Amino acid sequence: MSQGNLYILSAPSGAGKSSLISALLASDSSTQKMVSVSHTTRAPRPGEVEGVHYYFVSKEEFESLIEQDLFLEYAKVFGGNYYGTSLPAIEENLAKGIDVFLDIDWQGAQQIRKKVPSVKSIFILPPSLPELERRLIGRGQDSEEVIAERMSKAISEISHYDEYDYVIVNDDFEKTLKDLQSILQSERLTKDYQQKQNAMLIQQLLAK
């Protein structure tokens, strides 16, 4: 069975990351793909489903998982709630040949690279700051104050783009989606990947 690849996907709010992930999962059935479901200690919001949006656990349960070193990465955010990525769940899905995407920020990405050096990371850039602000306003979800905070945070996040393996400017949604698909395809054609997947064939070809 083919081994799946682990990907980090990061972007400032408004760059189109969530829409791209949804479109990517719905396209090209030649490879299995999924987004990792995180654990959190916060209460479920209306419409959120256990195991689909998050795994909702108590603070005590979360801290027990930390002590057992069962998180690939985790963080305690403003308000005191924990968020984390389960290591056993990731390993299980990768072993099934599923490409797993981690929708996390640059800080989480730094944690994961230390534990999984083979992870591939992708950063989505907006075409410009004015366009990013226009998209945030167009969503109609946030106040002017919150949008200003998101814009300030976006500049900080963008400054870490050079820590990533791939960088894509989301100026044209369909083109960006094709770029993401190309990355997935090319990563399954690397020498390291093929040596693992076709070890027996290579051994047979070199037997004489």
From Swiss-Prot:
Catalytic activity: GMP + ATP = GDP + ADP
PANTHER family found in the cross-reference section: GUANYLATE KINASE, GUANYLATE KINASE-RELATED
Top-level EC class as recorded in UniProt: transferase
NCBIfam families cross-referenced by the UniProt entry: guanyl_kin
Listed SMART domains: GuKc
Binding site for ATP: 11-18
Domain Guanylate kinase-like: 4-185
One annotated Gene Ontology cellular component of this protein: cytosol
Organism classification: Bacteria, Pseudomonadati, Pseudomonadota, Gammaproteobacteria, Pasteurellales
TM ranges: none
Swiss-Prot/TrEMBL keywords: ATP-binding, Cytoplasm, Kinase, Nucleotide-binding, Transferase
Keyword Kinase: yes
GO molecular function, one term: ATP binding
Organism: Haemophilus influenzae (strain 86-028NP)
Localisation: Cytoplasm
One Pfam match: Guanylate_kin
Name of this chain's protein: Guanylate kinase
Similarity field: Belongs to the guanylate kinase family.
EC number: 2.7.4.8
SUPFAM superfamilies listed in its UniProt record: P-loop containing nucleoside triphosphate hydrolases
Function: Essential for recycling GMP and indirectly, cGMP.
